[in-house]
UniProtKB/Swiss-Prot annotation:
It is found in: Cytoplasm. One of its GO terms (molecular function) is serine-tRNA ligase activity. One of its GO terms (biological process) is seryl-tRNA aminoacylation. Belongs to the class-II aminoacyl-tRNA synthetase family. Type-1 seryl-tRNA synthetase subfamily. Keywords: Aminoacyl-tRNA synthetase, ATP-binding, Cytoplasm, Ligase, Nucleotide-binding, Protein biosynthesis. It comes from the Bacteria. It holds the Pfam family Seryl_tRNA_N. ATP binds at residues 262-264, 349-352. This is Serine--tRNA ligase. Its main location: cytoplasm. Catalyzes the attachment of serine to tRNA(Ser). Is also able to aminoacylate tRNA(Sec) with serine, to form the misacylated tRNA L-seryl-tRNA(Sec), which will be further converted into selenocysteinyl-tRNA(Sec). SUPFAM superfamilies: Class II aaRS and biotin synthetases, tRNA-binding arm.
Length: 418
């Protein structure tokens, strides 16, 4: 959730920074005015309660002494109670209104994030491995999949519909091998493996920042408070929702493999062939919880972890830093890793590593204490793909194809495929 103290302290600077993230300035004026009203109502409520409590003490004395002012004081207390009911109702409504506005405002971008409008203004940091030059015309992964019977597109459409995949034969074994390889790499790097439910509740999605703003991107289970999770970031981030952690337990590192479900609203006509954009896909996720002063260092090491998998597989990739206009809702800073796909003659996103600072922690109430007597502070949360399995599968198939259409595989995968 957006930190309202930023608006209270310096609304002008907040407006300027958030305009770079395409948030209209008048929204902050609304929040500022509502906040002033809410705090005024809270003060009125507090004053009236204090007055009521004082009069209640006096009533006992007046009754004991049979003072003629007793009835007048009783009437006054009843009037205060009625006034308190009205104020409490108004306060509750205005607090809800304020919270709803705060829930749809994205995280503030870090000062190190380049200012820009969209993906065209993202900044390339580095490239690793040059794209392979083939001595033949390389095939796209969807053509290689048909040629080698790695995917059955027709049956997946028959069973479910468009944007779903059935991997078969060697294609299925490669898919499984990539999942295990990514998990093994993450566990060896110190991440604790979690096997989590794929159905999550509304509170978890609010905590991660997916709700209420991105409801159209989610699959909701009818007549329930349950959703199919769009990413294991949701489950892993919410492991410690409504908890106060010990500072000595931080940082916490988690990794999980889950199927992910997205409606891909607004993606009609994009990446219609192959496995790049699906309603259901598998992803290995990383999540970190840490102290605020460590979060940007943790972002660098998380991104390096995802890169190490691409490097072990010897896949050409590049790292970019997202500009303010392309930054995700919950993120203060994001690195994208893009793998080279010959079929696109371009780099395509395969990992997104983000520092969400205290944005998710505020929504999910994840805090920590340095000592028992210390005040609580919000942790910082980070998340990253390590990696998106379907896109990784496509990258292996395309970059390791042979002239006869067969698929070689990286040496590090050979022990996983039998």
């Amino acid at each position: 959730m957006f930190d309202i103290n930023l608006i209270r302290k310096d609304i002008a600077t907040t407006k300027e920074k958030m305009l770079n993230k395409k948030v209209p300035s008048n929204l902050f004026d609304q929040i500022f005015d509502l906040d002033v009203l809410v705090r005024s109502l809270m003060q009125q409520e507090q004053n009236l309660n204090a007055k009521k409590n004082q009069l209640s003490k006096e009533i006992g004395i007046l009754a004991k002494n049979k003072d003629p002012k007793l009835q007048q004081t009783l009437d006054l207390v009843n009037n205060i109670k009625n006034e308190l009911q009205d104020i409490s109702l108004t306060l509750s409504n205005k607090q809800d209104e304020l919270n709803k506005l705060l829930l749809v405002i994205p995280n503030m971008p870090d000062d190190s994030v380049p200012i820009g409008n969209d993906e065209n203004d993202n900044v390339e940091i580095k490239k690793v491995f040059k794209p392979k030059k083939f001595d033949f015309l390389p095939l796209a992964h969807w053509d290689l999949a048909v040629k080698n019977k790695l995917i059955d597109f027709d049956k997946s459409t028959k069973i479910t519909g468009s944007r779903f995949i059935i991997y078969t034969n060697f294609g299925a074994r490669l898919y499984r091998a990539l999942q295990q390889f990514c998990l093994d790499m993450n566990v060896k790097a110190g991440f604790s493996e979690i096997w989590a439910p794929v159905i999550v509740n509304q509170e978890s999605l609010i905590g991660s920042g997916n709700l209420p703003k991105f409801a159209d991107d989610l699959f909701k289970l009818e007549n329930s408070n349950y959703y199919l999770s769009p990413t294991a970031e949701v489950q892993l981030t919410n492991l410690h929702r409504n908890e106060i952690l010990k500072a000595s337990d931080l940082p916490l590192y988690y990794t999980a493999l889950t199927p992910c479900f997205r409606s891909e609203a607004g993606s009609a006509g994009r990446d219609v062939r192959g496995v790049i954009r699906q309603h259901q896909f598998h992803k290995v996720e990383l999540v970190k919880l840490c102290k605020p002063e460590d979060s940007f260092k943790e972002l660098e090491s998380m991104t390096r972890q995802a890169e190490s998998i691409l490097e072990a597989l010897e896949l050409p990739y590049r790292r970019i830093v997202l500009c303010t206009g392309d930054l995700g809702f919950s993120s203060a800073k994001t690195y994208d890793l893009e793998v080279w796909l010959p079929s696109y003659n371009a780099y395509k996103e395969i990992s997104s590593c983000s520092n969400c600072t205290n944005f998710q922690a505020r929504r999910a109430k994840i805090r920590y204490k340095e000592t028992i007597d210390a005040t609580t502070e919000l942790v910082h949360t980070l998340n990253g793909s390590s990696l998106a399995i379907d896109r990784l599968w496509a990258a292996i198939v395309e970059n390791y194809q042979q002239e006869d259409g067969s698929i070689n595989i990286p040496k590090v995968l050979k022990k996983y495929i039998y």
